C-alpha cells in the first residue's frame, strides 16, 4: 500500500489556497501536471530529501524565491548533504531553527505569509537527535505565495486494523514477514517499516515470497532465463565510486535538464564492474 499519504502539520491556515503536499505535488509534476510558480515566493517546510526535492523543483518552475523552513539546525537535517549544498548553490535560502506556527491568508483565502516560531536546540532525545523548544522571541513573518509541506509520509493502515495488528500506524510484522497472530498473512515494505528505500521494499518482497512459498509446502528454486556469466573469483582491489560533476548551478534553474554530467565510456566500464549486490542474505527460514 506504500507510504503515499502526506503528514499534516496541524496549524491554522493549512487549508489555504496555495498550500501543497510535497509528495502529491511532485507526483503531479512527474505525470505532466505542472503548476505555474513563475514569479511566486515559495516556502518549503521540512528538512528531509523530499523537502529538498520540492525546493529544487520550485526553483526549476520559475519561483522568484524559495525558502526552506526547518525547526532544527541545518546540520540536523536528514536530507543528504549533497542535496542541501546543491539547493543552496541554486539559490535556496534555508531558514533554520524556525517552527511553523500558522499560515496567514488574504481576504480571498490565498496564502500571504508563513509565520514561524524561533527555536532553541535542546537536549538529545532517544532517537539521538536534539529536540528544539520555543525561544523567548517574537514570531517571524515570511511573505510567500506558496507553501509546500514536506514533513514526512505515512501509510493508511486503518482498513487493516480489524484483521491484523498495527503498531504506531503501521502493520506489525517480524523480520521474516510473518504477521503475528494472523495466520497465512505476510507483510513487508513501507507498510511495515514506514517510508524507506525501494531496495528495502524489494528485499522485503523477496523475503515474503520465499516464506510464503515455504509456508505453502513448496521449495521452489527461482530460475532465470537470462544467461549469467560465471563470476571472476580473483580478488580484485577495492575500487572507488566514480564521482559525477554538476553542470553550473546557474544553468540548472528554470529547467529540468540533468544536473549531473554523464560518464565517459571508460568510467562506465569501471563503474559497472563494481559490486551491484543488495547484500541481503537469507529469508529468515533457513
Regions found by a protein language model. Give the residues of each.
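A conserved FAD-binding loop/helix module that cradles the flavin
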Residues: 188-222
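N-terminal glycine-rich dinucleotide-binding loop that anchors FAD/FMN and/or NAD(P) in oxidoreductases
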Residues: 14-22, 26-29, 78-106, 113-119, ...
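Mid-to-C-terminal Rossmann-like scaffold of FAD/NAD(P)H-dependent oxidoreductases
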Residues: 99-105, 110, 120, 207, ...
Amino acid at each position: 500500500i506504500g507510504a503515499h499519504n502526506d503528514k499534516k502539520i496541524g496549524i491554522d491556515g493549512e487549508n489555504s489556497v496555495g498550500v501543497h503536499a510535497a509528495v502529491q505535488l511532485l507526483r503531479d509534476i512527474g505525470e505532466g501536471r505542472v503548476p505555474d510558480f513563475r514569479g511566486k515566493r515559495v516556502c518549503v517546510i521540512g528538512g528531509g530529501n523530499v523537502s529538498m526535492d520540492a525546493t529544487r523543483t520550485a526553483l526549476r518552475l520559475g519561483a522568484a524565491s524559495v525558502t526552506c523552513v526547518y525547526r532544527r539546525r541545518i546540520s540536523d537535517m536528514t536530507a543528504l548533504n549533497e542535496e542541501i549544498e546543491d539547493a543552496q548553490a541554486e539559490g535556496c535560502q534555508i531558514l533554520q531553527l524556525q517552527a511553523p506556527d500558522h499560515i496567514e491568508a488574504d481576504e480571498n483565502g490565498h496564502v500571504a505569509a508563513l509565520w514561524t516560531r524561533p527555536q532553541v536546540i535542546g537536549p538529545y532525545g532517544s532517537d539521538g537527535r536534539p529536540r528544539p523548544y520555543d525561544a523567548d522571541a517574537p514570531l517571524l513573518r515570511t511573505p510567500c505565495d506558496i507553501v509546500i509541506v514536506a514533513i514526512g509520509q505515512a501509510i493508511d493502515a486503518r482498513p487493516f486494523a480489524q484483521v491484523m495488528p498495527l503498531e504506531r500506524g503501521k502493520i506489525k510484522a517480524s523480520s521474516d514477514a510473518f504477521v503475528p497472530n494472523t495466520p497465512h498473512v505476510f507483510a513487508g515494505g513501507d507498510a511495515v517499516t514506514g517510508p524507506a528505500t525501494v531496495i528495502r521494499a524489494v528485499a522485503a518482497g523477496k523475503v515474503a515470497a520465499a516464506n510464503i512459498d515455504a509456508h505453502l509446502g513448496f521449495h521452489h528454486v527461482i530460475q532465470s532465463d537470462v544467461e549469467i556469466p560465471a563470476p571472476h573469483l580473483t580478488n580484485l582491489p577495492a575500487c572507488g565510486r566514480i564521482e559525477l560533476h554538476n553542470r553550473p548551478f546557474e544553468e540548472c534553474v528554470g529547467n529540468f535538464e540533468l544536473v549531473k554530467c554523464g560518464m565517459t565510456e571508460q568510467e562506465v566500464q569501471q563503474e559497472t564492474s563494481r559490486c551491484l549486490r543488495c547484500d541481503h542474505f537469507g529469508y529468515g527460514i533457513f
